[in-house]
Amino acid sequence: MKSDPLVTIYIPCRNYGRFLRQCVESVFQQLYSNWELVIVDECSDDDTIEVAEELCRRFPSKAKLLRNSKPAGLQRLANSILGIANGKYMIRLDADDWLDESALLVMVAKLESLPNSGLVYGNYFYTDSNGKVLGIERQHKLASEGNFRYLPPHGACTMFRTRSLRAVGGYSEDVKAQDGWELWYKLFNRINPTNVDVPIFYYRQHDESLSRDQNRLLNARSRIFERLSHSLSGDYNLKNVAVIPVKESYPGFEGVPFQKFGDSSLLERAINTAVKSSKVSSVVVSSSSQRVLDYAKELEFSGAVPTHLRVLRSTEAESRNIPIRDLMTHAGEYFFSQSGEYPDAVAFLSIHAVYRSESHINEAFNVLRVTESDTVVSVKEERDPMFVYGEEGLELVNPGRFDDLTYDRERLYRFNGSIIASWWDVLKQHHLFGEKIAFVEMSAEDSMQITKPSLLKVASEKSL
């Protein structure tokens, strides 16, 4: 190594005194010795302070403890460290995790050998709450398989060039989770991310892990994409059309759009949710039933729903399922006939997705824009073990699930039927999805579809 630049390591800690000693000891044992350590206590009421003070006394010139009078939150804390960091590079180590002894050595060597790169990440071990190794996450595959733009590396133990973090304004303090996602997209086009194909830290899984709070993570991710999309805004306003295809009846489920869910019908709910989306320019209700369109018109005239477009599809298609792409292009062509302009993007919105919100629709269009994907689909993650048929019988696709682990390489997603958003040029090229497909993840609850009368009661009870 030509030089040994200083590395700033910071450890946020709130009531993780039982883990802190192992965490800090892993810093002390690094093969690379030019580091400074800042432990930040977030108003712990366990023995965090005592443990931290004892550890800092061992390296008084290199380690110090900061005590916040009230919890600052991860993003605000990170910005405060960014303001005082002396290191050329900066890395966050969570108090319940710990570093491999070679972590700093290999990451600094990588960045020093690539002066145009300002971010490096590596693999990591999963452990249980007692520190027993359960498996390994190999993050290098994210880049080698071309998915790295949409699947950022773990936010902790990713090493950044400190100057690069400062140049993009650090962390957004109103985003309370998924800090790795935000920085990844803020830095992606400014620096060249790189990786080391070795495990650099141990990631402890336990009941208090933030990564297990799915709704908080999904909400934070949605806000991040909203912020990123806004940063791309110019004087050209995208024309995004949302189409709600409506079939009047199915076998065993009559009068679908007229069915009540809470205080409104399924159609009324779908239209209002779509119109509330700040990313949607125009809403089109598409049906082969004139009765359905008349009902939509009545809803508009009564003030129950805002102004929207209505288009009658050929009645020849009444008895068959119409390909989703055809529904979307038909709506786009109708939009052109009314406005004289083709849409930039079209979103399919299922009338059956009663828990889909305007924020889900916004996120779909934001992801489509930020990731430059051809299509975005709404999905829910399959969290149960799944099998496929192989040469010797069934083969387990995601064995980590039996150890309660979620490897990125084993993540499986099911289309939940709620949203498909595609660029118009992709649809016109006779593709529904195109080549590059991104996703909006929705919770199992938000993914619920009303496909039969009995589910109306179940969904209504859930909403109480």
Which residues fall in each region the model found?
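Short, acidic, metal-binding catalytic loop of nucleotide-sugar glycosyltransferases
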Residues: 25-34, 273-280
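A conserved acidic beta->alpha catalytic loop
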Residues: 41-50, 70, 94, 288-293
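Acidic donor-binding/catalytic loop of UDP-sugar-dependent glycosyltransferases
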Residues: 47, 97-110, 322, 350-367
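Glycine-rich, basic loop-to-helix element that forms the pyrophosphate-binding segment
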Residues: 68-85, 322-327
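Short aromatic/hydrophobic "clamp" motif used to bind/position activated sugar donors
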Residues: 90, 346
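Conserved donor NDP-sugar-binding/catalytic core segment of glycosyltransferases
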Residues: 102-134, 367-374
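Conserved core of the sugar-phosphate nucleotidyltransferase
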Residues: 131, 326-330, 342-345, 351-443
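Conserved nucleotide-sugar donor-binding catalytic segment
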Residues: 143-223
